[in-house]
Amino acid sequence: MPTFETPTAIILTVDVPMGYVEIAATDRNDTVVEVTPSNPKRSGDVQLASEATVIFTDNTVAVRVPKKLSLFGPGDSVGVRIALPTGSAVTVDAAYATVRTTGELGESRVTSAYGAVTLQHTASLTLNSAHGEVDVHRVAGDLDATTGHGRLRVDRVDGEARIKGSYGDIGLGEVGGVIDARTSGGISVDRAGSDVSIRSAHGAIQVREVSGGTVRLENANARVQVGVPAGMAAWVDAASQHAAVRNELTAEPGPRADDRTVELRLRNNYGDIIIHRAI
C-alpha cells in the first residue's frame, strides 16, 4: 500500500478500466493508495491488481491500471482506494467503474463510460458520463457536464452550469451563476441565481425560482414552468404553438428603478407554459 508524504494538496490522476474508485479527502499530510482485486478469489482480478502502477513525482500521484481485452466472460476488475489531502485536484478516467469521492476536492475532471458517479464536494468540475447515474452534492466553482443515458443531480453550483444532456433527466438545486443547458430529457432547477438558457426536445422544463436577469426556456413536446418570487417584476414574452400559456402573475404598474426584475422568454410547440409566483 504505497504511502507518500504530501503536506499540501496534490494532483491525482486515476485510470481504471473496470472496477471501482473511492477517493477520500481529509486534512492530512500524506497520500495513501490501495489497489486490490475486486474478487480476491479470481485470478484475473488478482493479476490485474498486481500490474497496477502508482507513481509519485512533482506533487502528482498517478494511478494506472492496464486495460485488458476480454473476449469471453467478465473482464478483470480492481478496486482503487485513495486517501489524500483536502483541496487536491483530481482527474479520473473510468471505463466500466463506479466513482465515489468524499471530502473537499480541488479542480476535478471525471470521465465515466459505464457506472455510477457520486461526488461530495469539488471546486470546478468537468464531467463526462455516458451511461450511469450521477449525484454531486456541491460544485464550488463552474460545472461543465456532458451526460448520455442516466440521471444527473447536482445539489449546488456556486458558479456557472454548462450542461449537454442526451436522454437522462437533469436536476439542479441552487445555481449561483449563468445556466446554459441543452438536453433531450427533462430538466429542473430549484433556484437560478443569474441568467438562464435551457432547451429540451422531449422533457419537461421547470425553474422553481428565478432571481432576475434573462430567462430563456424552449421546449418541443413537454411543459415549461417557471416561478417568479413575490415582489419581483417580470417582463413576459411567452408563446406555445399547440398548447396553452397560463400566466398566473397579476398585472401591476411598471417597476421602479430599484425593483428587482426578470425577463422571461418562453417558447413551446406542443406543451403548456405556466408562469407563477415562486413558492
Language model features by range: what are they?
Residues M1-I279:
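Intrinsically disordered, low-complexity terminal regions
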